[in-house]
Structure formats: structure tokens, C-alpha cells
Amino acid sequence: MPSNCRRFEGKVAIVTAATKGIGLAIAERLLDEGASVVIGSRNQKNVDEAIEYLKNKGLTKVAGIAGHIASTDDQKKLVDFTLQKFGKINILVNNHGINPAFGHILEVSDQVWDKLFEVNVKAGFQMTKLVHPHIAKEGGGAIIFNASYSAYKSPPGIAAYGVTKTTLVGLTRALAMGLAKDNIRVNGIAPGVIKTKMSQVLWDGGEDAEKELTDIQEIALGRLGVPDDCAGTVAYLASDDSSYITGEMIIIAGGVQARL
């Protein structure tokens, strides 16, 4: 959704997993408000297509690099690439996440459990460690994690995924306390059911299926979310408009009652 704000002129942001869905919407919003943005994703073709999409909309201060977010070598390449392209880092959006398991939590294998935590939790922690000195050098900035409402309200079938997102709530709070001295704010978003490829299996069945899902999930606003619903909140958390907010997680779920 286009914005008339220009809150990020002169700022540089990294957005992980940013070639589709929520990540792409976040990158577009930050670019639209004046930021220079580096997008990351595993697939170079997806990176190239996302950059072309953004540039066709007149958002030219964008670059991207392919890599696996759980690879320490690729994490460093992403940070180094950003510094080479734009000279600094002010904002990090840890948007990445996977959910390879569906079923009862006790049926999740050790291998899948470890993979969930490696990508959903550890990779964002490692990225934060890498960018920390660069953001601190600029006098501070913002780091945002993409968690999930499943951190608070474990939906059937994705409990293991939800545990990793609950962990992100704790990690966000811990990092907020640890980085406050450097004027780096750490916050997060906890989206509900957002219409993306990752959640498509839940809602892909026409209006009747969506209506049934909103009823089952008890979504007060009566609709599913879209990526722009998340992008606007991330832009707020990345901006000086939220300069007195850190360690918080904003639930974006249309009124679903989800709290720890």
C-alpha cells in the first residue's frame, strides 16, 4: 500500500525472506518511504524477479542476494553485500521462517525440530549479532522479528512451529534489554492468518472457505489478513514514531484473542 510518509530517507534496511508475501510487502513499504533495501532469499531467480517487480514500481534503491539464512557464510555475505552496496545498516527485519511439520507435536522428529529452531530462531539471533556493530555505529536503529500469533495461541497441527515463535517473543525481549544501551530498539510482529503462499493450504477454497476459517479462528474483523497489514506495522516499528517502544510484540490478527 503506497505511503505518503518519507520516514526512511537516508536509511538502509535488510529484509530477509523478502521475495514474496509479507517480506516483499515490507521491502516495498520501506522503499516507498525512502529507504535503501537489500532483500535476501534462497533462490536467485526469486530475488531477481522481486527486484524487477519493485523497480517497475519506481522503487529503485533496492538490491538483493541469494543465500540460505541458516548458513553463517551466507549471513555474512548478506551483511557484507549490504555494506558494499549502501555503506551502512540502520534496520534489520528478520522475516524468515519455515514450517515443515504438520501434526501432533510429539510426532515431530528430532531432525525437523532442530531445523525449525535453526531457521526460525537461531538464524535471526545470528543475523542480529552480525548487524549489531554496524547499527550501533550509526547511533542506533531498529531490529524487527516476524513471529506469529501461534506464539500465543497454538493452532492445531503447528504446535512445534508455535514453540519457535514463542521463543522469538523471549528473544525479542532479551535483545531489547541487551541492545538498549546502543539505542537499538528490538520489537516484533505476530501475524495471524495472512494470505500468503505459506498459509495457502488454510484458506485456498474461495469465499466460503475464508469465511469458515475466520469463524474457526474467531477473527473479530471477519477477514483474513494481507501482507500490507504487516508491512505498515513493521514500518512503524522501524521508524522514529516508535522511538519509545522496545521489547514489544504487536499481534496482527484481526482481533484474535492471543496472549501469553
From Swiss-Prot:
It catalyses: a secondary alcohol + NADP(+) = a ketone + NADPH + H(+). InterPro entries: NAD(P)-bd_dom_sf, SDR_fam. PANTHER family: DEHYDROGENASE/REDUCTASE (SDR FAMILY) MEMBER 4 (PTHR43943), DEHYDROGENASE_REDUCTASE 4 (PTHR43943:SF2). Its EC number is 1.1.1.184. NCBIfam families: PRK07231.1. It is an enzyme of class 1 (oxidoreductase). Substrate binds at residue 148. It comes from Caenorhabditis elegans. It comes from the Eukaryota. This is Dehydrogenase/reductase SDR family member 4. Catalyzes the reduction of isatin, 4-oxonon-2-enal, 9,10-phenanthrenequinone, menadione, 2,3-hexaenadione, 3,4-hexanedione and 2,3-heptanedione. GO terms for molecular function: carbonyl reductase (NADPH) activity; catalytic activity. Keywords: NADP, Oxidoreductase. NADP(+) binds at residues 14-38, 165. The active site is at residue 161. Belongs to the short-chain dehydrogenases/reductases (SDR) family.
